[in-house]
Amino acid sequence: MYRQLFPTPEVAAWRRAQDRARAVPRFTPGSIRLLDYELQYSDLLSLCPQWHDIFIDGALEYRADSAAPRILDCGGNVGLASLFFKRRFPSARITAYEADPAIYKMLRANLDANGAGDVESVHAALWTENGRVRFLAEGSDSGTIEVRSNGIDERTVDVPSLRLRDLIANDPNGRINLLKLDIEGAEDAVLADCEPVLDQIDAIVMDLHEFDPLVRQAPRVLELLTRNGFTYAVDEFVPQPWRPPVAPGTAPFPGKALLWSMTVRAWRA
């Protein structure tokens, strides 16, 4: 009751955003002030849970051994994660990657407008090779590389792709202290390709997405982490019943989502 009557500033900001989101059509770009952040967004309804996860639930809280950790923000969206990391570690060396061309512009604008102009940003999808890929830009935080398409009929665009393995191997800092990975279903393929360089990573926080009910990637990803010396914890299971699956499938359990995501945190013990 006390927290309802006297919410933290972060909760009060989230409630205000939620109230506005109810009155705004989906996928309507705009801007909003939350705490001392001036934020552009592509879809306010998807910004709200991001804010709650990061600034209220502490989904990206991380204890670094250095005051200036090296962080890769893979799937930066409009920049909330990078802004959080920059507030937590003002001297952090952060690179944020975002594939959606329209959202990337918002990411860059939000970094520049909120005291994080030294965060490097790159417009690219993280993948298993350098080049170009087709990307389903659905207008919020669920865009995905076309080979991982789950049947959402949205605008498809051609975007540059970068091989994450090469970025890790050639990083001028030598080690990646934290890899934040939110690449909407490409986790298995990308991490498998990165296996030869995983010893250069200290910790990982990722959203692991299951879009194909016939081919689950979680067992392979978790086994890969164990094989490469990581301890992991899994939580924040989120059903995604609104998504059509990559492959058709039915389950004998009515009302249970075939598609879901979960958060995996991995570290070296």
Model-found features: residue ranges?
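Phosphate/nucleotide-binding beta-alpha loop and adjacent structural elements of enzyme active sites
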Residues: M1-A269
